[in-house]
Amino acid sequence: MSKITEQVEVIVKPIMEDLNFELVDVEYVKEGRDHFLRISIDKEGGVDLNDCTLASEKISEAMDANDPIPEMYYLDVASPGAERPIKKEQDFQNAITKPVFVSLYVPIEGEKEWLGILQEVNNETIVVQVKIKARTKDIEIPRDKIAKARHAVMI
């Protein structure tokens, strides 16, 4: 997490708690010439457009008062969607037995990306059951090698 996203999270998290929303993710990216602050929120039963609008208004007010971002940017508040990021310990626990996509910093068994069913989670590793050709195999992945993890939609 970058310094900017950490600072934004400190500002936004109490606002989301007051609204009874979960702050799922904060991402600050540059795409072409534009900068985007993307904030994913959720709540029991999911968020709708009205929830995102309300959260966006509250976040805008707070960021205007104490903005850690020096350049102009677009604020995007949305649901995390079906491919929700997996970052926190509880996210990993909730994803057990579900399809996940994991990107790695370094290859494991020659691959830097794995798609499969999350089988196990502990402090050091996760185990993802993957299909290779017609066989299933458990891949043990050290948590410190995970660049990104998210829920996956498997068809």
UniProtKB/Swiss-Prot annotation:
Domain of life: Bacteria
Main location per the UniProt record: cytoplasm
GO biological process, one term: ribosomal small subunit assembly
Cellular component GO terms held in the UniProt record: cytosol
Stored Pfam families: DUF150_C (PF17384), RimP_N (PF02576)
Cytoplasm keyword on record: yes
CDD domains, alphabetized: YlxS_C
Keywords linked to the UniProt accession: Cytoplasm, Ribosome biogenesis
Family indicated by similarity: Belongs to the RimP family.
Entry protein name: Ribosome maturation factor RimP
Organism classification: Bacteria, Bacillati, Bacillota, Bacilli, Bacillales
